[in-house]
From Swiss-Prot:
Keywords: Antibiotic resistance, Cell membrane, Membrane, Transmembrane, Transmembrane helix, Transport
Keyword Transcription on entry: no
Family per similarity comment: Belongs to the ABC-2 integral membrane protein family.
Pfam families for the chain: ABC2_membrane
Highest taxon of source: Bacteria
Ranges where the ABC transmembrane type-2 domain occurs: 46-273
Role: Probably part of the ABC transporter complex DrrABC involved in doxorubicin resistance. Probably responsible for the translocation of the substrate across the membrane.
Record protein name field: Probable doxorubicin resistance ABC transporter permease protein DrrC
C-alpha cells in the first residue's frame, strides 16, 4: 500500500499555488484584451486620423508658421518645442478617442458581458491603461519620425533620447486616467470633449510655443507649473540640453497626483459601468 501511494503521488500532476495561477491568468487575459483593443483602434480610421494624421499636419503647419519666429526668440530650431508639443497633444487627443470608445462599449453592453465571463475583473481596466500607453508610444514615435524629417535631432545621446520618448507615455497615462474617469460617470460624449478642450487650453498656455516671460505676469505661475509645461521643458532638455531634473520631477508629481485622485473613482466607475 505504501508503494502504491508513493507511485500515485509521483504520478499526480504538479499544480501551481492559487495565487500564482491567478497571477498567470491575469497577465494572459490582460495581454489578450490589450491586443483586442489595439486591433480595433488600428482598424478605426477616425481614431487613426485624429490621433496620427492630424497631429502630423499640425506639426508641419506650426513649423512653417512659427518655426522662424521661434528661432528669433530662442536662437535655436523651433522644432525642439514644436515636436514635444505635438507629441503631447497627440497623446491627449488619443486619450479622448479611447474614452469615447469605452463609452461605446458600455452602451453596447460589451462591458457587462465581459464582467460575467470567467475573466479576471481587473484585466479589463488594466488592459485599457496598457493599450493606451502602447498607443501613446506609437504615436510619439510617429511624431518623432515626422520631426526628424523636418530637421529635429537629438544632441544628448541614447539614454536622454529614450527618456524623451517616455515623457508623453508617462503623462499620457495620467491624462487617460482622468478622461476615462469622466467618461465612466457620464453618458454624453460632449462632456468628454469638454475635458479635451480644457486640456487643449493647457497645451497652448504652456512654454511650448512661446517663452514664459512672453506671458502676462498674472498668468505666468499657471503656465510655469502646469504639467504640459513641465513635460515640454523636460523633453527640450533631453533633446538639446538643459535642466531636466526639476521639470521631470514636476511632471512625475503631476502624473502621480492625477492617478491617485482618479484611482478609486476609476475603479468604482468601471465596476458600475460593467454591472449595469
Amino acid at each position: 500500500m505504501i508503494t502504491t501511494t508513493s507511485q500515485e503521488i509521483e504520478l499526480a500532476p504538479t499544480r501551481l499555488p492559487g495565487s500564482q495561477n491567478a497571477a498567470r491568468l491575469f497577465v494572459a487575459q490582460t495581454l489578450l484584451q490589450t491586443n483586442r483593443l489595439l486591433t480595433r483602434w488600428a482598424r478605426d480610421y477616425i481614431t487613426v486620423i485624429g490621433a496620427i494624421v492630424l497631429p502630423i499636419l499640425f506639426m508641419v503647419v506650426l513649423n512653417i508658421v512659427l518655426g522662424n519666429l521661434a528661432y528669433v526668440v530662442t536662437h535655436d530650431s523651433g522644432l525642439y518645442s514644436i515636436v514635444p508639443l505635438i507629441a503631447l497633444g497627440a497623446a491627449i487627443t488619443g486619450s479622448t478617442f479611447v474614452a469615447i470608445d469605452l463609452m461605446r462599449e458600455r452602451s453596447f453592453g460589451l462591458l457587462a458581458r465581459l464582467w460575467v465571463l470567467p475573466v479576471h475583473r481587473a484585466s479589463g481596466l488594466i488592459s485599457r491603461i496598457l493599450a493606451n500607453a502602447i498607443r501613446t508610444l506609437v504615436t510619439t514615435l510617429v511624431m518623432l519620425g515626422t520631426g526628424v524629417v523636418l530637421g529635429f535631432r537629438f544632441r544628448q545621446g541614447l539614454i536622454p533620447s529614450l527618456m524623451w520618448i517616455s515623457v508623453p507615455v508617462i503623462l499620457g497615462i495620467a491624462i487617460a486616467a482622468m478622461v476615462t474617469t469622466v467618461a465612466l460617470y457620464t453618458a454624453q460624449t460632449v462632456v468628454v470633449e469638454g475635458v479635451e478642450l480644457v486640456q487643449a487650453i493647457a497645451i497652448f498656455f504652456s512654454t511650448g510655443l512661446v517663452p514664459l516671460n512672453s506671458y502676462p505676469g498674472w498668468i505666468q505661475p499657471f503656465v510655469a507649473h502646469q504639467p504640459v509645461s513641465y513635460a515640454i521643458a523636460a523633453m527640450r532638455g533631453f533633446a538639446m540640453g538643459g535642466p531636466v531634473l526639476s521639470p521631470m520631477i514636476g511632471m512625475l508629481v503631476w502624473t502621480a497626483g492625477i492617478c491617485v485622485v482618479c484611482a478609486v473613482p476609476l475603479a468604482i466607475g468601471y465596476r458600475r459601468a460593467s454591472t449595469h
